[in-house]
């Protein structure tokens, strides 16, 4: 199902959010109002590092295959978990191979050039929606919604690339 592909493509972030709330991968600063992409510090050894992501992809593919009995769909679900990591290595935070002390990988554009990172994410989102729409008839409303979520969703964060949300809305000094 389409929703399963959307879930798989963002599963690492959902795992990170759960671990951030539980504590092991808590960001600094902890309040969304005090954070900008450039100023946010994250350590995601369980949700985003290379080896744990491969494990998450295998579990995701296995679960999808067991639930829907569709090998192709299962491979897509597992593959989307890995594609998420690949995209993060280009435009997201720096990650490591295994843990805090292992070699860093990725361009770390959220810290080094957050505006560029968000534009790259929006362009990738547009390319994915275009590719998806060319594979079959997509109702106009769904197409608009997909562009809004994947392109608009990335561009929406441009103001917070370097300015914390609380300062943008006058809630913090």
Language-model regions, residue ranges each:
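N-terminal membrane-targeting hydrophobic helices
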Residues: 1-173
């Amino acid at each position: 199902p389409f929703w399963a592909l959307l879930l798989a493509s963002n599963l690492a972030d959902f795992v990170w959010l759960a671990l951030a709330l539980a504590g092991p991968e808590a960001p600094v600063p902890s309040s969304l109002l005090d954070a900008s992409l450039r100023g946010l510090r994250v350590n995601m050894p369980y949700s985003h590092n290379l080896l744990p992501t491969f494990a998450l992809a295998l579990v995701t593919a296995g679960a999808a295959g067991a639930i829907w009995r569709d090998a192709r769909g299962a491979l897509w679900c597992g593959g989307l978990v890995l594609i998420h990591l690949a995209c993060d290595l280009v435009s997201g935070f720096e990650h490591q191979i295994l843990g805090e002390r292992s070699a860093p990988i990725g361009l770390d554009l959220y810290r080094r050039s957050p505006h560029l990172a968000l534009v790259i994410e929006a362009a990738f989102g547009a390319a994915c929606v275009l590719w998806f729409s060319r594979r079959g008839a997509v109702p106009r409303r769904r197409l608009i919604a997909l562009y809004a979520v994947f392109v608009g969703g990335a561009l929406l964060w441009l103001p917070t690339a370097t300015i914390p949300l609380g300062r943008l809305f006058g809630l913090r000094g």
